[in-house]
Regions:
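C-terminal lobe helix-coil module of Hanks-type protein kinase domains
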Residues: 1-91
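Short, low-complexity patches enriched in S/T/P/G
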Residues: 95-110
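Single-pass transmembrane signal-anchor helices and their membrane-water interface zones
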Residues: 110-131, 136
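Catalytic-center loop of serine/cysteine hydrolases
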Residues: 125-128, 134, 162-304
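A structural "domain/chain start" motif
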Residues: 129-157
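Glycine-centered tight turns that cap/initiate beta-strands
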Residues: 169-172, 314, 580
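Short coil/linker segments at helix-helix boundaries
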Residues: 279-394, 398-408, 425-429, 433-436, ...
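Alpha-helical protein-protein interaction modules
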Residues: 382-384, 395-398, 404-592
Length: 592
C-alpha cells in the first residue's frame, strides 16, 4: 500500500523538524516493538516551540492502521499549507509567543512554512527516488522462537519455510532456499554481510509465537545495501487461520517491494482455507522431522503426516509431505523402489486433486514418471509444471538438472544447476554437484579441482564417492580406494562399502568384492536385498552375464540407478556392448 510511503515520509519530516526519531528504543528489537505497539512521541514534547497542530498531523501520518493515514502525499502537504495560512492569518494581531518562536525557526531554516513545504516535497522526491523501484531477490531468515520453549522450534521453522514457499511462487522474485537460510539460525552476523553472502537485495527477519489458539508473526524488511528498515508489521490470527496469515504476510511483502505479480500469482497469494489446528500442528512437526534426513526422523515424519490427515482428510500439504518423504526414502535406498514409487504417486496425485498448484507435488510426480513409467516427455512436463508453480524451489532445478544429465543434455543441465545455486548459494550438495556434472561431461581434471574445493569446505559422502569414480576412470586406484574409505567414514554405509570393494577389484584385489558378493547373495535368500549392489559387484569382477541379469532385476523393481547409469563413464565399454544391456536400455527408452 502506498500509505506505507506516507508513514515513512512522516518519519523523515518528524526527524527534520525535531532532530529526533518518533519511535525510541535502546536496541533494534525495542525500536521495532515501539513502531508496532506505541504512539510516537509528541513533536511538541520534543521541541516546545512547534505548533500543537503538528501533533495531529504526525499522529495521522504515523498511524498504525494504514486506513487512518493520509491517502496521498498531496493531502499531507495540504494540511501543512492550511497550518501555515492559519498562522499567517494572525499577523494582523499579536501572535502567541509560541507561534512567534516557531515562525522564527522556520524563517531561519528557509523563510516560512511555504519553504518548509517545498523542502518537504523535495525531500519526499529524493526519499522516494532513493528507494529501489523493485527488489528482485530476498532471503527469509529463520524466524525467532519467541516462546523460549525449544519444543516450539518446529513452529518457528515451519513458519519460516511456509513464507519461503509462498514467496517462491512469484516468478519475478528470487527467493533463497531453506537450506541456505537455515545456516543463519541464531547467527550474529550483520544483516548487510548476510545479504552479501546470499547475494540478495533484501532480508526479511522476525519472530513467530504461538500462545494457545493464537499465533503472532512479527516481520520486518531490511534493504540490504543501506541496512535501512523499509517496513515492519505485526500479524495475529487464530491458529485455524494460519494459512491465511502466511499469505497475508507474503502479500504485504510483495506489495512493499513492488515486485511484478501476475494475476495467477496474485490469486495464489489470496486463496486459502481454514485448517484444523491439530492437523496443521502435526504437519509442522512432520516437516520439521523430515528435514533432518535420517531414517528414524523420516519415519517419524510419516507418522505425523498421517496424524494430520486423520484430523483433516483434505489437507493437501500433508499428502505432499508424505509424497516427499517416500521420495527421500527411495533415493536413500530405505524402501523397496516399487513400494516407494507407488506411495509417491498415490500421495502426489491426491495432493494435486485438492490443489493443482503445489509445485512440490508436481516434482514428486516427475520422479514417478521418470523412474517408474520411463516416460521422459511426461517427466519434463512435470518438471516444468513444478517450476511454473514454484519458480524459486531449488530442489526442482537440481533434479531437473540430473534428469538432463541422464538424458545427455549436459549444457541444459549446467544452466539449471547454475540457477539452483543462485537460489541456494550455500548448499554443499549443489557446490559439489557441479563437479558431478563435469565428471559426466568427461572433464575429469576440472571435476577433481571443483570437488576437492568443496570437500575442503565440508567433507561428505557424495563428493568423496564422485571423486573416487573419477580416479577409477583415470586408473588411479590407490586414490580411488582412499576416497571410498572416506565415504564410509562419512556415513556412506553399504553403498560405499560396495564402491570400495569394486575399487579393490579393479586394482587387482578381488577378494573383498567376492566376499561381499557372497554375503549379499546369502542374505538375499532370506530377506530383501537391493539388486543394485549385487550387479555392480559382478560388473567389477568382470562377470557381465550375471551383472546384466541382476541389472534386469533392478529394472523390474524400478530402481533409480537404471536411469542413471547409461551416461555414467564408468559403465562404458564391456557393459555397453553386452546385447542384453542394449536391449534393456532400449526398453527403458535411453537408446532409440
Amino acid at each position: 500500500d502506498h500509505r506505507t510511503d506516507i508513514w515513512s515520509f512522516g518519519v523523515v519530516l518528524y526527524e527534520m523538524l525535531t532532530g529526533k526519531l518518533p519511535f525510541k528504543g535502546d536496541y533494534e528489537q525495542a525500536v521495532i516493538y515501539s513502531i508496532l505497539n506505541e504512539k510516537p512521541t509528541l513533536a511538541t514534547a520534543v521541541k516546545n516551540n512547534l505548533p500543537a497542530e503538528l501533533d495531529h498531523i504526525f499522529d495521522k501520518a504515523l498511524a498504525k492502521d494504514p486506513q487512518e493515514r493520509y491517502y496521498r502525499l498531496d493531502d499531507f502537504a495540504a494540511e501543512l499549507k492550511a497550518l501555515e495560512k492559519q498562522i499567517e492569518g494572525k499577523k494582523a494581531g499579536e501572535e502567541p509567543i509560541r507561534a512567534k518562536s516557531w515562525k522564527k525557526k522556520l524563517l531561519f531554516i528557509g523563510g516560512g512554512l511555504v519553504i518548509l513545504i517545498g523542502m518537504a516535497l523535495l525531500a519526499a522526491a529524493l526519499f522516494f527516488k532513493e528507494k529501489p523501484k523493485t527488489i528482485d531477490s530476498i532471503a527469509v531468515l529463520p524466524l525467532q522462537n519467541y516462546s523460549h520453549d525449544p519444543e516450539q522450534d518446529y513452529f518457528a521453522d515451519g513458519m519460516t519455510e511456509a513464507l519461503i514457499t509462498e514467496l517462491s511462487k512469484i516468478k519475478a522474485l528470487r527467493v533463497i532456499s531453506r537450506t541456505s537460510v537455515m545456516l543463519y539460525k541464531k547467527s550474529t552476523k550483520p544483516l548487510p554481510e548476510i545479504a552479501h553472502e546470499l547475494k540478495v537485495d533484501a532480508i526479511l527477519e522476525g519472530s513467530a509465537q504461538r500462545v494457545g489458539d493464537r499465533i503472532r508473526i512479527t516481520a520486518q524488511l531490511i534493504e540490504a545495501r543501506s541496512d535501512r528498515h523499509l517496513w515492519a508489521e505485526d500479524f495475529e490470527r487464530d491458529f485455524r487461520d494460519i494459512l491465511f496469515l502466511q499469505k497475508e504476510v507474503s502479500r504485504a511483502i510483495t506489495s512493499e517491494i513492488r515486485i511484478a505479480v501476475t494475476p495467477e500469482e496474485s490469486k495464489q497469494l489470496s486463496t486459502a482455507r481454514e485448517v484444523n489446528a491439530e492437523a496443521h500442528e502435526a504437519y509442522l512437526k512432520g516437516l520439521y522431522l523430515i528435514n533432518k534426513f535420517t531414517e528414524t526422523d523420516l519415519n517419524k515424519g510419516i507418522a505425523f503426516f498421517e496424524k494430520a490427515l486423520k484430523k483433516d482428510p483434505e489437507y493437501a500439504l500433508a499428502y505432499t509431505g508424505l509424497a516427499e518423504t517416500y521420495d527421500n526414502l527411495l533415493f536413500m535406498s530405505l524402501v523397496r523402489p516399487k513400494e516407494g514409487l507407488q506411495k509417491m504417486k498415490e500421495y502426489a496425485l491426491k495432493a494435486l486433486s485438492i490443489d493443482e498448484s503445489l509445485g512440490e507435488a508436481h516434482l514428486v510426480l516427475s520422479a514417478v514418471k521418470m523412474i517408474n513409467d520411463w516416460d521422459f516427455p511426461g517427466t519434463e512436463r512435470e518438471f516444468k509444471l513444478a517450476l511454473q508453480f514454484s519458480p524459486s524451489y531449488s530442489t526442482t532445478y537440481t533434479w531437473y538438472a540430473c534428469f538432463m544429465l541422464w538424458m545427455g543434455r549436459n549444457d541444459e543441465a549446467l544452466t539449471l544447476i547454475q540457477r539452483a545455486q543462485e537460489i541456494d548459494p550455500l548448499s554443499p550438495t549443489l557446490r559439489g554437484f557441479s563437479g558431478y556434472c563435469l565428471y559426466l561431461d568427461r572433464q575429469y581434471d576440472k571435476a577433481i579441482i571443483r570437488i576437492k574445493e568443496n570437500l575442503a569446505l565440508e567433507p561428505n559422502v557424495f563428493d568423496s564417492s564422485t571423486l573416487g569414480c573419477i580416479y577409477l576412470q583415470k586408473r588411479m586406484y590407490e586414490e580411488a580406494i582412499a576416497c571410498f574409505k572416506k565415504a564410509i567414514d562419512y556415513g556412506g554405509g553399504v553403498m560405499s562399502e560396495k564402491d570400495l570393494a569394486c575399487a579393490y577389484a579393479f586394482a587387482g584385489k578381488p577378494a573383498m568384492a567376492r566376499n561381499m558378493l557372497a554375503n549379499l547373495l546369502k542374505q538375499s535368500s532370506k530377506k530383501y536385498v537391493s539388486p543394485d549392489n549385487i550387479w555392480q559387484l559382478y560388473w567389477a569382477l568382470g562377470e557381465m552375464d550375471n551383472a546384466v541379469a541382476w541389472l534386469e532385476k533392478a529394472a523390474e523393481e524400478r530402481s533409480p540407478i537404471v536411469i542413471m547409469i547409461y551416461r555414467d563413464p564408468q559403465f562404458e565399454g564391456v557393459l555397453h556392448s553386452h546385447p542384453r544391456f542394449i536391449t534393456l536400455m532400449k526398453k527403458v527408452g535411453l537408446i532409440k
